[in-house]
Structure formats: structure tokens, C-alpha cells
Amino acid sequence: MIRIKETPGCRITIRQNPHPNLPKCEMVCDTMLHKKLDKYDLTHFLNTHTMSLFIGRPRSGKTSLVHSLFEHSHLLRYCFTKVYLFQPTQSGASIKENIFDTLPPDQIYRELSYENLEEVKIRIEEDAAQGLSSCIIFDDVTAELKNKQTLQLFKQLAFNRRHLRLSMFFLVQTWFSVPKELRRLWTNLFIFKVSKNEMVNIWDEIIEQDMGYLPLIMKQVYRVPYKFLFINTDSGRMFDGWDEILLDD
């Protein structure tokens, strides 16, 4: 991260010029998913077609959190017309009464391949043409993105998600497993306890704040198991679970 420091003696002056009163252009693809998501500050950031990354070691709580978000009737449940799941069989086997087991079989994929993702893309495009919202959950399939065709198709979905009315949730065990070209695409980060080296890299690549805040935040958030740090990359706002973290400047 480049840190820009103010140099003593340097000043800027703004000269006000005449300017046009431009009309506001409203994008039809920027609709909210459901007004219930605005009840909480954190879920407000999920109330549009975003990309959310969940990072954490095995048994850290990331899969449980995603499951809870989609199971709770006041959160993500009923927000999407279709939910597609890319998840190896063993990854979801540890959850009792897994809500994703109730998905239609043709919306569950046990491997992420170019052909499978292309099939989902076509179905999402058809639904988007009717104004319907979709969601894809990618769980433990990072290795499959080493395939260049699959990675390119994933990026197409990411870049066009607003027009496709698509939200994407991606679960990984480490930040370093995410391809570098994808790391700046995430709208939201849910970070469970990871190594200090990973946190330093996430902070350096994504967060435009002084590195001195990092030890304080890590100590606060990870003092008990299964807690997560939430970051909205557009606004820079951070949360200790559901409670906002305010930095004293």
C-alpha cells in the first residue's frame, strides 16, 4: 500500500468555475435485494449484487456463518430466485440439517469446471432477463480456478454481476489461495482468524489505513473463537462481527 503523507508547506487552492447541472442516471441493475437487509449495518452491504469472500482455517466458522445467513428468514433467505452451490461432497458433510441440501439437484455442483460454470451462467442470464436475482456459492473450489478458461469465465461473471443480478459468495482457507487478479474484486471480506502474515498482506493490499491499527483490531476481534472481521472495501468500514470498529484519527 502506498502511504501518501502531507508535506509541511504544501497547499492547494480550489478556484470555483461554472459547472453544468448534470441529470442523475439511475441504473436499473442497481436494485436492492430486500429491504429487510437494511435492518443491520453489516447486511446493508449485502443488499445489492456483490462479491463476498469468506476466509478462514478449517473449523474457523466461515461455513457455519454462510449457512446461518441463508437459513435466517430475516437475512438472505428468500432474497434470491435461485441459489447455485459449487461444493465438494465432503465440504458440506459436517453440517447437521444443511439448508443447502434442500436445493434442487440441478443447482448443486460437486466440482467447478468450465462446462458447469458456463451452464450456470446461461441460466443466470435467462433469469436476469426477467428481472430475477441469482446467487452462486463457491465453497472449497479455489484449486479449480487454476484452469485458465474457468478463471476467465469466473471473472466475466464477477465483472457483469450487476447486469446479471448476481451475488457471489466465495469460501477459502487462505488469502494466498485466491488468484492475485481476483483479490481486488471483492466487495466484502469476512475474515476469520488467519495467520499474521496473511492479515498483514490483506491490510496492505486492500485497506487504506495505517498499519498501526492492525494489532489492535486483531486483538479485539480474535480474542474468542469463531469471530470474524468484516470489511466493506468500497466504504472502508470495518466490523468486529456485527459491531462497527471506529478508528481514532
For each predicted feature, which ranges?
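P-loop NTPase motor core of the ASCE superfamily
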Residues: 2-9, 40-59, 65, 78, ...
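A structural signal for isolated positions on well-ordered beta-strands in alpha/beta enzyme cores
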Residues: 84, 167-169, 229
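Conserved Walker A/P-loop ATP-binding site and its immediately adjacent core
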Residues: 83-97
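Post-Walker A helix-loop "phosphate-sensing" segment adjacent to the P-loop in P-loop NTPases
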Residues: 71-83
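Intrinsically disordered, low-complexity eukaryotic regions enriched in glycine, serine
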Residues: 31-32, 44, 86, 102-103
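Conserved P-loop NTPase mechanochemical-coupling segment
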Residues: 95-112
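N-terminal pre-Walker A segment at the start of P-loop NTPase domains
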Residues: 1-40
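Conserved P-loop NTPase motor cores
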Residues: 52-73, 88-92, 109-212
